Structures are given as C-alpha cells and as structure tokens.
Amino acid sequence: MATVNQLVRKPRKSKVEKSDSVALQGCPQRRGVCTRVYTTTPKKPNSALRKVCRVRLTNGYEVSSYIGGEGHNLQEHSVVLIRGGRVKDLPGVRYHTVRGTLDTAGVQDRKQRRSKYGAKRPK
C-alpha cells in the first residue's frame, strides 16, 4: 500500500482500455475499396466456405472483412462500408461489411432480421 506522500509525488495510473477494432479509429463505420474477394475455411470444429474480402480503407488501413448473408455481389474495386465485429471462427477477420449500402446489395428474399442484411420489407 502506498503512503499519502508517495501518492502525492506520483499518482496512480488509470488503465487504458484497448479497442477491438483499431482500424475504425473510433468511428462507427468506415468506407473502403475491395482489393480481393475470396472464401476461406473456419477453425476446427467448424466446416464451411466463409465469404471474406480484403478492404483498403479511406484512412489507409487494409483489413479483412466478413460478408454475411447468403450470396453477394462484391468483386474487386467494389466500394463497401465496414463495421466492427469479429468472426469467432475466422482468425484475423475483425470486421463485417454492411449489407445494403454503397456497392453491397442486400440479401435477396430475406424475411426475418432484415435490417441486419439490408433487405427491404416484402410486399
């Protein structure tokens, strides 16, 4: 335990909280251009072909971003919006692409949880 005198000379340091999404630099989303669109396999025990794209952001960072939902229209040079949120079974993928904005189309025939996938309300 520190004495009062020691605390007067050198106060206690407060802990600095580390961000999970460094490339966003405190912003809710960031815009970027796809440099590569590809599929990758998840960690054990899962098995799939997860859709991922490499994105060069407007602030100069280059990050991997997961493309959620069934089917997508992204290719190289597509302009996308990314948000934070990692994919637990894909190492190094710490961002999600936002569906239904910029060049990313929403998911077709989506009936539930539509706002997450940029789908309009069905007639």
From Swiss-Prot:
Gene3D superfamilies: Nucleic acid-binding proteins. Residues 111-123 have a biased composition (Basic residues). The gene is rpsL. Belongs to the universal ribosomal protein uS12 family. PROSITE patterns: RIBOSOMAL_S12. It comes from Alcanivorax borkumensis (strain ATCC 700651 / DSM 11573 / NCIMB 13689 / SK2). The modification 3-methylthioaspartic acid is found at D89. HAMAP family: Ribosomal_uS12_B. GO terms for cellular component: small ribosomal subunit. This is Small ribosomal subunit protein uS12. Part of the 30S ribosomal subunit. Contacts proteins S8 and S17. May interact with IF1 in the 30S initiation complex. Residues 1-22, 103-123 are annotated as: Disordered. It holds the Pfam family Ribosom_S12_S23. Coiled coil: none annotated. One of its GO terms (molecular function) is tRNA binding. GO terms for biological process: translation.
